[in-house]
Amino acid sequence: MTLTPFIVLAHGPSRQKVVEEIEVNAAPDKVWAVIADYCSIKDWNPLITACESDNGSQPESIRIITLENGEQIKEKLIKYDPESYNIQYMMVEPNPNAMPVNTHGATISVKSNDNGGSIVTWKGAFYRSFPGPNPPPDQTDEAGKEIISNLYKSGLETIKSQAEQ
């Protein structure tokens, strides 16, 4: 009997990253005033229709956001730093009907620019929710990136318009 060795390769989701930023013609403190409340996301992101938080903007606070399609996502506040204008959070209960991603974590930060204004950066990383090598078209890495990117861009555009008023 002859045994022939062979290699089995498995390929699942890989970590994806999305970074979006926007320049705002307003000082960082004015921009921060728009986003400072952890649940104010419903006021500056048109893709989010509601937000409920169990403990405001305190670290470990849990918020449940409702998207336009009625689906909800549960997120935990990891870091809240008003002095450096930084909010970090992560998804704690993925909902593939809301977004085809798992383990989404993100940071929103505000920095001053050279013109007296601000740069707002929203960056995140995630794994797609479909675990296997051949995801359906609406659950690919690219689909996840597109949804996250659209979420970030719509929020950043509204932050800009509100802070510049």
Regions found by a protein language model. Give the residues of each.
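Hydrophobic pocket/interface hotspot
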Residues: 30-34, 41, 63, 77, ...
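A conserved amphipathic terminal alpha-helix motif
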Residues: 119, 126-165
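Sec/Tat-exported extracytoplasmic proteins
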Residues: 35-45, 67, 81-84, 152-163
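Stable alpha-helical elements in mature extracytoplasmic
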Residues: 27, 34-37, 73, 144, ...
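Short, hydrophobic/aromatic-rich segments at coil-to-beta transitions
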Residues: 56-64, 82-89
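Hydrophobic ligand-binding cavity/cleft-lining segments
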Residues: 6-56
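Bacterial N-terminal signal peptides
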Residues: 1-5
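Hydrophobic-ligand binding "helix-grip"
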Residues: 71-119, 125
